[in-house]
Swiss-Prot record:
InterPro entries: ATP-Sase_PUA-like_dom, PUA-like_sf, Rossmann-like_a/b/a_fold, SO4_adenylyltransferase_pro, Sulfurylase_cat_dom, Sulphate_adenylyltransferase. It holds the Pfam family ATP-sulfurylase. GO terms for molecular function: ATP binding; sulfate adenylyltransferase (ATP) activity. It comes from the Bacteria. It comes from Carboxydothermus hydrogenoformans (strain ATCC BAA-161 / DSM 6008 / Z-2901). Its EC number is 2.7.7.4. It catalyses: sulfate + ATP + H(+) = adenosine 5'-phosphosulfate + diphosphate. GO terms for biological process: hydrogen sulfide biosynthetic process; sulfate assimilation. This is Sulfate adenylyltransferase. Belongs to the sulfate adenylyltransferase family. Coiled coil: none annotated. Keywords: ATP-binding, Nucleotide-binding, Nucleotidyltransferase, Transferase.
Length: 381
């Protein structure tokens, strides 16, 4: 089976006894932001391996400037715990700091915190390739604190009330499932939208080649106009249970914040899927993009710039699929010679408009069971 990234399994989990004991201790507390809430969980369960906690100054600047951790392992996105200058002074050098959710619930702890100053302009230019406040990621970072505290973390997963532990499987569990099913190859597929026929077509091409498909939708922090996670989950359930062989796919949600960092985020997503145990990962057109900030294939091309041994997981590059009325089937530009006038293409805006008006979506665009879930949601608004 594929190794964890950095060849290091990470599991920084508190037992219920340790958690209860921690509750009674009188350490300083630090409330984490929404993004940090999900990052903290993923650090603790080992999906950000080899990281064992929030980045220190060396890892932060190395990630931005070298595209690696200070240890030399490939890394693309800074995972930091942002604080004000006043908080940085307060927490720096302490033995432990208790990390809490916005409502005050204890999530875990930060050990031996060390404070350092961030460079937000450098960060947005490196991570997002722009400093335009029109980019949601840039806008977010520039509005945040300029300091960070680094340190190893430990978490108590049941305290993360926003995360469904029955659906957000730990990497040890997914690896166990892949092994029990004798999958030698597993291809990961990420989405933050309902799966329509185009995605289904690409996934089924992948299933003709690989032993297993890991469907891993992102359900952490997304943009305000994205379809809510619970509605998307009903769509995935309707599709997978009716149209996929049950022994060929594994479904789990990924409670990660969406950064809209295009190419760098595609690398981040590939590392997470390697930690889950995937041997391959599908990167489609404009993966993790937003607006027109990235070229359609930049997120695929970035993988060609790394040394061959930088990642064990292999990238599967797909173009957009569509229904061609002339071919009478799903296709991509690689297999269809006909012009766009023969391709069924519905924008997200058009789909939402049709659903709100109760109009049926074409079966060539989406399965009727998925359309029904979406129709009920939009008519309830």
């Amino acid at each position: 089976m594929v190794n964890y990234h950095g060849r290091k399994e990470v599991s920084n989990i508190l037992t219920s006894e340790e958690y209860e004991e921690l509750k009674g201790q009188n350490f300083l507390k630090l409330s984490v932001s929404k993004t940090e809430y999900f990052d903290l969980f993923l650090l603790g369960v080992g999906l950000y391996a080899p990281l064992e906690g929030f980045m220190d100054e060396d890892d932060y600047y190395s990630t931005l400037e070298q595209f690696t951790l200070s240890s030399g392992f490939l890394w693309s996105i800074p995972i930091v715990l942002r604080v004000s200058e006043e908080e940085a002074r307060l927490y720096d050098g302490r033995e432990k700091v208790l990390l809490t959710a916005a409502n005050g619930e204890l999530l875990g702890l930060l050990e031996s915190p060390r404070a350092f100053k961030l460079n937000k302009i450098l960060e947005v230019e490196k991570v997002f390739k722009t400093s335009s406040p029109e980019h949601p990621g840039v806008q977010k970072i520039l509005g945040e604190d300029e300091w960070a505290v680094a340190g190893k973390i430990k978490i108590y997963p049941p305290a993360f009330r926003e995360i469904d532990l029955n659906l957000s499987l730990f990497p040890q569990k997914t690896r166990e499932i892949f092994k029990s099913r004798n999958y030698k190859t597993v291809v990961g597929f990420q989405t933050r939208n309902p799966i329509h026929r185009a995605h289904e077509y690409l996934q089924k091409i992948a299933l003709e080649i690989f032993d297993g498909l890991f469907v891993n939708p992102l359900v952490g922090e997304t943009k305000g106009d994205d379809i809510p996670a619970d509605v998307r989950l009903k769509c995935y359930e309707a599709l997978l249970n009716n149209y996929y062989p049950k022994d060929r796919f594994v479904f789990a949600t990924l409670p990660a914040p969406m950064r809209y960092a295009g190419p760098r985020e595609a690398v981040h997503h590939a590392i997470i899927r390697q930690n889950y145990g995937c041997t391959h990962f599908i990167v489609g057109r404009d993966h993790a993009g937003v607006g027109n900030f990235y070229g359609p294939f930049e997120a695929q091309e970035i993988f060609d710039t790394f040394p061959e041994n930088a990642l064990e997981i292999k990238i599967v590059k797909f173009d957009n699929a569509f229904y061609c009325s002339k071919c009478g089937q799903m296709a991509t530009k690689k297999t269809c010679p006909h012009g766009p006038e023969h391709h069924l293409s519905l924008s997200g805006t058009k789909v939402r408009e049709m659903l709100r008006e109760g109009k049926p979506l074409p079966e060539e665009f989406t399965r009727p069971e998925v359309a029904e879930v979406l129709r009920r949601y939009y008519q309830s608004l």
